[in-house]
């Protein structure tokens, strides 16, 4: 999978992700993972498999983890929701993404975050948690 390193912000913090764009305006998926997970671990594996199946994927480090800014190793549930909304914004605003076909996939603890984000962000059209 060929992914581009991207940066975006949430609450003034810089977040870092890996964006793999599929051809032809394919649906897009943002992935969120386990408690202390980073984009190179389980969410990166899921992203690679989904991209192989023709989806645009964004795996990113939440605030305080991996390459992203913020207080190190601090679990901030409201902050993670803001991070997800910002990630959805990045996807929805990308010229090669159909903003009406953005989904969220949450793995482990990320499942709860994905469902909560989808409940409050109408740009998320499908969710797997």
Where are these regions (language model features)?
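Conserved dinucleotide-binding and phosphotransfer motif residues
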Residues: 11-13, 53, 93-94, 120
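Short beta-strand element of the alpha/beta-hydrolase
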Residues: 26-34
